[in-house]
Amino acid sequence: CEYGDFITLGNNFFANYNCKLVDGGQITFGDDVLVGPDCTFVTAVHPTDPERRRAGYQVFKPISVGSNVWFGTGVVVCPGVTIGDNCVIGAGSVVVKDIPANTVAAGSPCRVIRKVNE
């Protein structure tokens, strides 16, 4: 954790080794979430303009993860993303957009592959 003040964990949350939470903004996990090894959750957004970046300007966008979500190894979740309940996020995925509930998603960028029960 970068700060620890902006993290909310639901019941039965499990994170494997080397989980990184860059929590300048709120990161919320629902119940029964499984996080595989080497996953990263980042809320900080830095400007593309070099002068603003050099001046230390940044904003934070929250990350929200529903209940019953499983993250495979090495997933990166970017600022401002919401992941719905009952999702599976495949190993090595880079999640840059919201993922709807009850879906399996994977890739870089991460995209929905199918419904969970298909």
Each model region followed by its residue ranges:
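Conserved catalytic segment of ABC-fold P-loop ATPases
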Residues: 84-87, 100-102
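Flexible, glycine/small-residue-enriched loop-and-beta-strand segment within the central core
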Residues: 1-82, 108-118
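Short-chain dehydrogenase/reductase
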Residues: 34, 70, 88, 94, ...
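Short glycine-rich donor-binding/catalytic loop of glycosyltransferases
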Residues: 92-93, 98-100, 109-110, 116-117
